[in-house]
C-alpha cells in the first residue's frame, strides 16, 4: 500500500515509474500498476533452488517458487516492462546465466507486449563478504552479455554500477 501511494504521488511528475520490490501477489502488482507503476525488476539471485534455500533459511523470501514466478505475476498484472537477473557468483555463473536467459525468453514469449530486460550484476569482493562464492570475471561478464545479445537480440541489458567505469564504458557497445 505504501509503495502504491508513493507511486500515485510521483505519477504527475514522471512519465514512467519502476520498482524493484519483494515478491508480491498478482493483486498487489495490479494495485501498483493502477497507481502508475509500469516497470518491475526482480532479481532471482540464483536459479539453483537448493542453494537459494540455503541462502534464505527462513522468512518470506525463502519461497523459491513464489519469487521465481514474481515476474510472471507482474506481467499478468499489467507491468509494461519486466527486468530479471541472477546475481552472478552465488552459483556457477554459466548455469545462472543460462537460466536467466531461459526465464527472460519465456516471459517474452508468454507476454509479447511486455518489454523484457536482463540485469547482469556480479558478486564483488568486499569486507565481510562470505567465502562461498563462484567468481565471475570481467571476461565471463563479456561472454554472458554477448550470449544474451545473440539469444535475445531485442532484450535490454542492465549493467551494475558495481562494475569499474572502464569496464562499463567498453560494455556499452556490446549491449
Regions found by a protein language model. Give the residues of each.
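Core AdoMet radical
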Residues: 1-74, 80-83, 112-119
Amino acid at each position: 500500500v505504501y509503495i502504491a501511494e508513493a507511486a500515485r504521488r510521483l505519477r504527475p511528475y514522471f512519465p514512467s515509474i519502476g520498482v524493484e520490490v519483494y515478491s508480491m501477489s498478482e493483486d498487489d502488482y495490479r494495485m501498483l500498476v493502477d497507481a502508475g507503476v509500469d516497470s518491475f525488476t526482480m532479481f532471482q539471485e540464483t536459479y539453483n533452488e537448493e542453494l537459494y534455500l540455503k541462502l534464505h533459511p527462513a522468512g518470506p523470501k525463502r519461497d523459491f517458487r513464489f519469487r521465481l514466478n514474481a515476474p510472471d505475476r507482474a506481467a499478468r498484472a499489467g507491468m509494461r516492462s519486466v527486468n530479471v537477473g541472477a546475481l552472478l557468483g552465488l552459483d556457477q555463473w554459466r548455469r545462472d546465466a543460462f537460466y536467466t536467459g531461459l526465464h527472460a525468453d519465456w516471459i517474452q514469449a508468454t507476454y509479447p507486449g511486455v518489454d523484457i530486460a536482463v540485469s547482469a550484476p556480479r558478486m564483488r569482493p568486499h569486507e565481510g563478504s562470505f567465502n562461498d562464492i563462484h567468481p565471475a570475471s570481467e571476461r565471463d561478464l563479456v561472454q554472458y552479455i554477448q550470449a544474451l545479445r545473440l539469444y535475445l537480440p531485442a532484450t535490454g541489458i542492465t549493467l551494475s554500477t558495481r562494475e569499474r567505469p572502464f569496464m562499463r564504458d567498453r560494455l556499452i557497445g556490446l549491449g
